[in-house]
Amino acid sequence: MVKEQFRESDVAKKISHICFGMKSPEEMRQQAHIQVVSKNLYSQDNHHAPLQYGVLDHRMGTSEKDRPCETCGKNLADCLGHYGYIDLELPCFHVGYFKAVIGILQMICKTCCRIMLSVEEKKQFLDYLKRPGLTYLQKRGLKKKVSEKCRKKNTCPYCGAFNGTVKKCGLLKIIHEKYKTNKKVVDPIVSTFLQSFETAIEHNKEVEPLLGRAQENLNPLVVLNLFKRIPAEDIPLLLMNPEAGKPSDLILTRLLVPPLCIRPSVVSDLKSGTNEDDLTMKLTEIIFLNDVIKKHRISGAKTQMIMEDWDFLQLQCALYINSELSGIPLNMAPKKWTRGFVQRLKGKQGRFRGNLSGKRVDFSGRTVISPDPNLRIDEVAVPIHVAKILTFPEKVNKANINFMRKLVRNGPDVHPGANFIQQRHTQMKRFLKYGNREKMAQELKFGDIVERHLIDGDIVLFNRQPSLHKLSIMAHIARVKPHRTFRFNECVCTPYNADFDGDEMNLHLPQTEEAKAEALVLMGTKANLVTPRNGEPLIAAIQDFLTGAYLLTLKDTFFDRAKACQIIASILVGKDEKIKVRLPPPAILKPVTLWTGKQVFSSILKPSDDCPVKANLRTKGKQYCGKGEDLCYNDSYVTIQNSELMSGSMDKGTLGSGSKNNIFYILLRDWGQVEAADAMSRLARLAPVYLSNRGFSIGIGDVTPGQGLLKAKYELLHAGYKKCDEYIEALNTGKLQQQPGCTAEETLEALILKELSVIRDHAGSACLRELDKSNSPLIMALCGSKGSFINISQMIACVGQQAISGSRVPDGFENRSLPHFEKHSKLPAAKGFVANSFYSGLTPTEFFFHTMAGREGLVDTAVKTAETGYMQRRLVKSLEDLCSQYDLTVRSSTGDIIQFIYGGDGLDPAAMEGKDEPLEFKRVLDNIRAVYPCRSEPALSKNELVLTSESIMKKNEFLCCRDSFLQEIKKFIKGVSEKIKKTRDKYGINDNGTTEPRVLYQLDRITPTQLEKFLETCRDKYMRAQMEPGSAVGALCAQSIGEPGTQMTLKTFHFAGVASMNITLGVPRIKEIINASKAISTPIITAQLDKDDDPDFARLVKGRIEKTLLGEISEYIEEVFLPDDCFILVKLSLERIRLLRLEVNAETVRYSICISKLRVKPGDVAVHGEAVVCVTPRENSKSSMYYVLQSLKEELPKVVVQGIPEVSRAVIHIDEQSGKEKYKLLVEGDNLRAVMATHGVKGTKTSSNNTYEVEKTLGIEAARTTIINEIQYTMVNHGMSIDRRHVMLLSDLMTYKGEVLGITRFGLAKMKESVLMLASFEKTADHLFDAAYFGQKDSVCGVSECIIMGIPMNIGTGLFKLLHKADKESTPPRRPLIFDNNEFHIPIVT
C-alpha cells in the first residue's frame, strides 16, 4: 500500500471532536513504516550507525538536529516521526485493557463465545443501546448491568455448557473455575473430565478433594481465539464500538514502535557511547525475548521453557506500557525503575498536566519585588535589563515609522531599541546585533514587523504564585526604570498577597494589540479594585499609608501655609502635574492662620475645582465611643460631605481593604474606577511624605511598662492565681459543680482557661490605659495598620495562656507537663500560662511552652497549604466550565442546566454594595441629598413621596428590573415616608400649611428631583450589577471558596456555648462538605423542642433520644449458680432511672434484651418485681454453659434499653439571646429520621449537619440547602464572608443530577463526560483506556479540553458568536383572505 505523506494545507481547520479507539494489528501495520526485527541498536562496524530494521532506524524519524529524517526528509523541528511495528511471536495481554478482558470473559460463554444473555434480554439491551445520544455514564452503567446479569448465569443459554467463575490469579494470569461445582453436573465436558479420574481415585483417595479445585488457565492465546469467535451482533452488548475496535484488539499480537523524536538518544560526553531512552531499551528486551521464543519453538524446546519466556515477554510488554505494576515476582522484577508510557502521561510532571494543560512560556520575566509609593496603582517599574530582553512585535505604519527607525538604529544594547526585524511576507528574522543597522532602518517599509524593546506605557501582565484567585494576575502599565527589581505601589499587595521579604513575581508581555486591549479592559488593576468573592475592596491603603492618614487627620494636627502647601504639592505628579490645587480657607485665622490635617486630607478626594467628585460617607471608625455620631470624643465617626472630611480620623475601616464603608469604595461605586484609583495614588504619595517629615518610629522605650502597670499586673496575677487554686481545691474535695455534658476535669479546665484569659485581657486593658496617645505601637493598633491590642499587652504586660489544640498544655509523661512541676499539677504555670511579658523575658519553662504553641502553628500552616491546594484544584476542575449564558441560565460545557438564573437573581457578587444585596438604599439617598440639595424645591409629604415613586417606577426604563428589587425599593421608600411623617407630626407641621419655612428645609426632606435621581441611580446600579453573559461563574465560585481556605485553621472548635461538644470546622469541615462524605467526624442534629422554655421537658426528651445502656442503669449484673440452674441477675437502679427522667422499667428492659442480637428468646427472660430481671441462657452442651454465661454477662451491659442506638449523647443547649432562656437539644450522632419522630421534638425545625443523612431523610433539595448553610456557617465562624451566590452554585452543581455528588475523582466522573478533562485531572491512563474500550467520542467543548487542544473556549469573549447580517428582502404583500370583508375589521386599540 503506497502511503501518502501528510501535507499541511492552507485551509484553517478546527478540531471538532476526538474519537478514541483501539488499533487492530492490520491498522498498526498500515500506520507503520518499517517492521522492527533487530535487537541490536547500532552496527558493529567503526561508523557506529543505527542499524537498519533496528529500534533506532532513522526511517522512524530523527532525534539529531543536523540529520534529516530518512522517510520524509524533514529536520528535527518539522518531522513528526514515523512508526514501526514488532510482530509478537505469542500474543500477550495488554496491561491497560486487562480488567476489560476479564470483564468480557465473565460475560461470554467460554465454549461457544456467545454472550450469556437470553434472546429477550439481548433484545431489551440492544433496544436501549439504539437510543441516540447515549452518554458515557449511561454506557458504563449499562455495562455493569449486563455484566451482573451474565455473572449470575452459570449455564450458557445457547450451548448449555457450564461456565464457572473467571478471576485474576497472580500477575496477568486469568483462571476459569470450570470444574468447581457442587450440583449434579449436566455439562458433558465436565462429566467426561471427572469420569477420567475415576480409576485414579480408586487407587488414591487423596485425589478426589483436589478435583474440585481444577482450573482452566486462560492464557492470551486461548483468550484471543475466544474473542475472535465472538459473533458480530454480540459486540455492541459488550458496550464496545465495533468501529473503534473489536474484542480481539484487546490482546497484543503486534506492538507499535514509537518515533525516535519521543525517545531520543543522547550522546554522552563523559564516556564514548550514548544514553538510550527507557522505551528504547524496553523495546530491545521485547525483541530479544521474541527471538528467544521463536528459536525455542523452531528447535522444539520444552513447553516449560517456552511458558517461562512467554510470561517474561508478557511482563516486559506490560512494563513497556506501565512500569508501576504491583505484584511482580522477585525473580522477574526489573533491576532498575524505568518510565513507561503511562508514567509519561500521568502526574504533575506528565504530558497532560505538565505540557498540555499548563506550560512554560516565552516573553516572560521574573525577579524580586520592591515597594514604590511614587508609582500609580496601575503601574509597575520594570528594570532596563528586563525591558531589553522582552520584546513586542510592532507593525511599521505611517504613524510610527520614524520611531521604529530610531529603535532599529539603537539596536539590542541601547534602550529603547529593537532586537529583530521581520520583513513583510517573509518568515526570516534579522538580528540587529550584527550588520548595518542604519541601512536596515532606512529600508524599513510599511508592514514590516519590528520586535522592539518593552517601553513605557506597554501593557504587561503581573503575577504572583500561588495564584489562588483571579486577582493574582492583573494587567499593569510598564514604566522602565533603573535597578534590578520589579516595583509597584504597596496598595496592590493585598490581591497578590505579596510582601517584600524576598518575594519574586512574574511579568508577561502580551504579543498582540488585541491581547493588550483585552488585558487592560478585563485584567487591568483599575477594573479589579474589588474581589469577586463578596464585592469588598481589595486594592486599598495599607500599613504606612494608614498610619500617615490617621496621624494627618487627628483633630490636633495643624499646619501653617508653607507646610500645608508642601504636603499637598506631593500629589502634583504625573497626570496631576498641571492641575490647579484649590487651597481651602484656613480653619484658624487668629493668632496665626492654620490649616487642619482634615483639610489637607480632603485634597486627596477633590484636589481642584475642576474635579467633579463629590463623595459622601457617614460611618463609624474603629474607636467610636457608641453615641453622639460626629460628636464622638475619640473623633472616630467619619463624616465626608461633598468630598470634604468634616469629622473623624482615618483608619483601616475607612481606607483599608475588606470594608464596604471605605472611601475608595464609595468613589468606585459613585464616580467610577478611574477616580477611585487616582485618589488611592494621591494618598500613596501624600501619606508617606507627611509621615517621613513628621517622623514615626518604634523602639524599646515604647514597650517599657511603668511602675503603676507592673503593680496592677501583679495584683491581677495574684487574684487570678488565688481563684484558680480555689477551683483546684474544689475539685480535690469533690465540691466542684460540673458543667452540662462535662466531667469534673473538663469543667476545671474550662473554668481555669476562662479565668486566665480574663487575667490577660485585664492586663491588656490596664496597659492601654497607661500608654500615651503618641505611643507608636498604640497608634498602629488604633488605626489598624499593624498589630492589635493583644500584641501590645503581650509585649508590655503578660503573654498569657499557651493553647495547644484549643486546650492547656497536656501532661507529657509521668502525669506532668515537665519534670520541673509536681505530678498531677493543675497550676497555671505548670499548664502553660506565661505570666511574663516579652519585655521582661520568659523563664525557661515558659519559653518551652511558648515554642510548643508556635510549633503547632507552623505544622498547621504547612499541612493546611497542601490540603487547600488540592481542594482548590478539585473545585476548579469541577466548576471551570460553568458559564452564564445569554438566556441567563448557568450551564456546563455540554449544555446541562445547573441554575435557571445565576444565584436566583442574576446579579454579580463583585457588584454588591450591601451584604449579598446590590444596593444600600440609605447611603444612596444620603448621597443624592448631599449632591443635589434642591433648596428651592418644596419637600414631598408622606403620601406624595409614595405616589410619586410609584408613578416613576411605572416608566418603561424600570421594566428590566426584577419585581423583587422593585419591592425592596418600595419597602425602603415606605420606611422613609413613615420617618418624614413622624418628624412632621413631632414639630406640628401638616401637609397643607407650614409653621416656619426654614424648618422645612432642614428636616428629612425629599424633593421630586431628589426622588427621581434616587430612583434613576438605583436602576442604573441594578443594571450595572447584572452578571455579564459569558462570565466564568464556575471558576470564580471555585476561587472564592478555595482562596479563603488558606486563611482558615485546621483545628476542631468547641460548639458555641457548650464546652464539651466539639465540632469540626475550618478546612477539614469544608473538605467533608465538598467531598459529600457519608460519615462525617462530628455529626450534630439540632432539635427544637415543643416546649422550649421548660428545662424538665428538655431532660425528658433528652432521655428519649440519648442512647442509654443497661449497664448505665443497673446496680449490678451478676452470675447466679444454683444446684439445678444458673442464670444472670440484673438489678436495676430505680433512683438513677428517676433522676435521668427515663421511661424505663423492668418490662421495657426485658423487651430490649429480647430484640438485641444476643439470641435470647422471650421465654428465657423473667421479671421479678420492679427492679430485678433474670436471664437464663438456653442449654446446649453443658460443658460450654459457663462460657455462654460469661459472654452474656459481657454483652448485657451494652444492650440499649432506651434511645436511638446511633446517638452517642445529647446535650441541652441554653440560648439566652432573646432575654429569656430557650432550650434546644444538640444530638451527637446520626439517624435524623428517628430524632424527628421522637415525641416532644419539633420535626419541622430539626436539622442535621450531615448532608448524606439529610438527603436520605428529606431529599435532594434539603441536602442542597444543608450544603449552603454548612459552608456559610463554617466561613462565618472564621470571619470570612462569601457571597451566597457562589455557595449556591457549588451546591447546585453537587446536587443537579438528583444525588449528592462529591467534588472528588468519583463525583467528577459522574458529572463530566469529557475524556480529556477526566484524564487531565486524575487516573489519566484508566480514563484513556476506558475511552478506547467504549469507543468514546470527545466533543472538545469544556475548558480543559480546549486548553489541551489549543482552541478558544466557549466562555467569556469566546461565548459570543458573530452572526452574518442577511440582506433584507422586502416582505411579500399580504394576500387577502377568502370571504374577507373590510367592513367587519375591528381596529386594534393601542
Swiss-Prot record:
UniProt-annotated stretches for the region Bridging helix: 844-856
Assigned keywords, A-Z: DNA-directed RNA polymerase, Magnesium, Metal-binding, Nucleotidyltransferase, Nucleus, Transcription, Transferase, Zinc
GO cellular component: mitochondrion; nuclear lumen; RNA polymerase III complex
Binding site for Zn(2+) 2: 109, 112, 156
CDD domains noted in UniProt: RNAP_III_Rpc1_C, RNAP_III_RPC1_N
Function in brief: DNA-dependent RNA polymerase catalyzes the transcription of DNA into RNA using the four ribonucleoside triphosphates as substrates. Largest and catalytic core component of RNA polymerase III which synthesizes small RNAs, such as 5S rRNA and tRNAs. Forms the polymerase active center together with the second largest subunit. A single-stranded DNA template strand of the promoter is positioned within the central active site cleft of Pol III.
Protein name: DNA-directed RNA polymerase III subunit RPC1
Organism field: Gallus gallus
Lineage: Eukaryota, Metazoa, Chordata, Craniata, Vertebrata
Gene designation: POLR3A
